[in-house]
């Protein structure tokens, strides 16, 4: 299956110990009073949202970019969806990669990348878990946060 191309907006990077908040009226990011979960768990990958899904604080799809590149807040990255961390509350976290990366599914991530993802979300409840591209597209199409 050819992966559709989407765009990710970078909202959080390893450089920020506090959770960043996007202000759509100004297009700016500011630090909140809350610590970043990613920073606390030594997670190095950028976090953000899929632009085509909406813009925070309105409904949108969160995503994690599996990359070794450094990005800045607000950067727009051309991506493909390769997997999903399904959550019981339907606030799924899509796993994405740059379109130039030769990878199409969560199963193709390295053991180190999978370990880092598990460090971000170490507790997996009933109905939750890490899944590949096929399940990610099922979630995008069928769950309550679907477009």
Regions found by a protein language model. Give the residues of each.
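Hydrophobic N-terminal alpha-helices or hydrophobic patches in metabolic proteins across all domains
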Residues: 1-147
